[in-house]
């Protein structure tokens, strides 16, 4: 609050601007962060950025059985899905680490502004 008892809009705007900059920096960090989910003991791996976007999929040739193409295709599909889920779990953890403190800052509200 300012000396007149009203809201200090300048302070509120500065705080909002600072939070926006912190959010943008955290989002940039997430874009640059890489995680690798894997399955099948490493036969399949999926690389994702911190926002959860898949950037690479790697399948070890040992995962392929040339004598049973149909079974191999289904197995590989299952392994890819499991690797993606593993990567998503890691992404969620990273997002909580990077964005959690900012979300808590929002919950703290703006001084002198009830409920915000």
From Swiss-Prot:
Subcellular locations according to the entry: Cytoplasm, Nucleoid
Main location: cytoplasm
Keyword tRNA processing: no
InterPro entries, alphabetized: YbaB-like_sf (IPR036894), YbaB/EbfC (IPR004401)
GO function term, MF aspect, one: DNA binding
Superkingdom of the organism of origin: Bacteria
Keyword DNA-binding: yes
Keywords linked to the UniProt accession: Cytoplasm, DNA-binding
A Gene Ontology cellular-component term: cytosol
Parts forming coiled coils: none
Family named by the database record: Belongs to the YbaB/EbfC family.
NCBIfam families: DNA_YbaB_EbfC
Chain's role: Binds to DNA and alters its conformation. May be involved in regulation of gene expression, nucleoid organization and DNA protection.
Quaternary assembly: Homodimer.
Protein name per the record: Nucleoid-associated protein Tfu_0045
Organism: Thermobifida fusca (strain YX)
């Amino acid at each position: 609050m300012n000396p007149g008892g009203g809201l200090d809009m300048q302070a509120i705007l500065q705080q909002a601007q600072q939070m926006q900059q912190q959010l943008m920096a955290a989002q940039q960090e997430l874009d640059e962060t890489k995680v690798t989910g894997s399955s099948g003991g490493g036969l399949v791996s999926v690389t994702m950025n911190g926002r959860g976007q898949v950037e690479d999929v790697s399948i070890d040739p040992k995962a392929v059985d040339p004598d049973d193409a149909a079974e191999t295709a289904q197995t590989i599909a299952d392994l890819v899905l499991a690797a993606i889920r593993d990567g998503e779990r890691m992404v969620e953890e990273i997002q909580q680490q990077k964005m959690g403190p900012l979300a808590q800052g929002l919950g703290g509200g703006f001084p002198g502004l009830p409920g915000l």
